[in-house]
């Protein structure tokens, strides 16, 4: 059997049983997958390859270019205590959804795409009529960074469109090669000697940026 188009996340898998996931359990689960260490109260970190296209690196760019620059210099991805629960909850839902949809003959989970020094892993790919259609699963609210990331994958796969799968709805996103300009801006920031302007306000990571600079 072949899949024509994906359905919303919570119409396919159980989302309710993870609502009571606590911080300690989430942190222990995350530590099973990679080395996580505590930098400051409420702040954790792990090693990260900044060549990889991910919602986190694009989110960081949109949230604060300086934070992205600092993380690159440290070689670390910074996590707030609050975000750890969201990460693990999202990861478990990802796995459940991917496991069910990968049973279709024309669906491939965790599809790696690589062009030059640009590396990405698409959650799901639907093979249809010689075209590879990317599907990204998102457990948070709809964000522009999600759309940008998917458009980058669409361009890399030379597809016409892709799908953003959220908890209760699915969005169709069409190809826009201008999204690749975001990667150019990110590369410029990562290669810069001086930090870009900050947008600190009440950012929890402010002490780390301040200490590095």
Swiss-Prot record:
Changing residue 203 to A: Probably no 2Fe-2S center assembly, wild-type nuclease and DNA unwinding. Optimum pH is 7-9. InterPro entries: Cas4_exonuclease (IPR051827), CRISPR-assoc_prot_Cas4 (IPR013343), Dna2/Cas4_DUF83 (IPR022765), PDDEXK-like_dom_sf (IPR011604). Mg(2+) binds at residues 94, 123, 136-137. Coiled coil: none annotated. Its EC number is 3.1.12.1. The keyword Manganese applies. GO terms for molecular function: 2 iron, 2 sulfur cluster binding; metal ion binding; single-stranded DNA 5'-3' DNA exonuclease activity; single-stranded DNA endodeoxyribonuclease activity. Pfam families: Cas_Cas4. Binds 1 [2Fe-2S] cluster per subunit. Not required for nuclease activity, since mutation of the Cys residues leads to a colorless but active protein. Keywords: 2Fe-2S, Antiviral defense, Exonuclease, Hydrolase, Iron, Iron-sulfur, Manganese, Metal-binding, Nuclease. It catalyses: exonucleolytic cleavage in the 5'- to 3'-direction to yield nucleoside 3'-phosphates. Its cofactor is [2Fe-2S] cluster; Mn(2+); Co(2+). Belongs to the CRISPR-associated exonuclease Cas4 family. Monomer. CRISPR (clustered regularly interspaced short palindromic repeat) is an adaptive immune system that provides protection against mobile genetic elements (viruses, transposable elements and conjugative plasmids). CRISPR clusters contain sequences complementary to antecedent mobile elements and target invading nucleic acids. CRISPR clusters are transcribed and processed into CRISPR RNA (crRNA). A ssDNA exonuclease that has 5' to 3' activity, yielding 5'-OH and 3'-phosphate groups. Has Mn(2+)-dependent endonuclease activity on circular ssDNA. Can unwind dsDNA; unwinding does not require ATP. This is CRISPR-associated exonuclease Cas4. It comes from Pyrobaculum calidifontis (strain DSM 21063 / JCM 11548 / VA1). The lineage of its organism: Archaea, Thermoproteota, Thermoprotei, Thermoproteales, Thermoproteaceae.
């Amino acid at each position: 059997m072949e899949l024509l188009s994906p359905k919303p996340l919570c119409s396919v898998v159980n989302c309710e049983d993870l609502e009571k996931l606590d911080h300690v359990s989430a942190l222990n689960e995350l530590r099973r997958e990679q080395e996580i260490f505590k930098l400051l109260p409420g702040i954790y970190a792990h090693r990260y390859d900044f060549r990889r296209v991910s919602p986190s690196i694009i989110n960081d760019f949109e949230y604060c270019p300086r934070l992205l620059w600092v993380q690159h210099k440290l070689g670390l991805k910074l996590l707030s205590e609050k975000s750890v629960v969201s990460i693990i909850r999202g990861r478990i839902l990802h796995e459940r959804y991917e496991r069910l949809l990968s049973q279709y003959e024309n669906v491939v989970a965790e599809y790696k795409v690589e062009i030059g020094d640009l590396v990405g892993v698409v959650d799901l790919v639907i093979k249809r009529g010689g075209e590879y259609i990317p599907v990204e699963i998102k457990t948070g609210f709809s964000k522009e960074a999600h759309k940008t990331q998917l458009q980058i994958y669409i361009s890399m796969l030379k597809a016409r469109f892709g799908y953003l799968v959220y908890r209760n709805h699915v969005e169709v996103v069409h190809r826009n090669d201008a999204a690749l300009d975001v990667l150019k801006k990110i590369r410029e920031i990562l290669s810069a000697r001086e930090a870009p302007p900050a947008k600190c306000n009440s950012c929890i990571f402010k002490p780390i940026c301040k200490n590095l600079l």
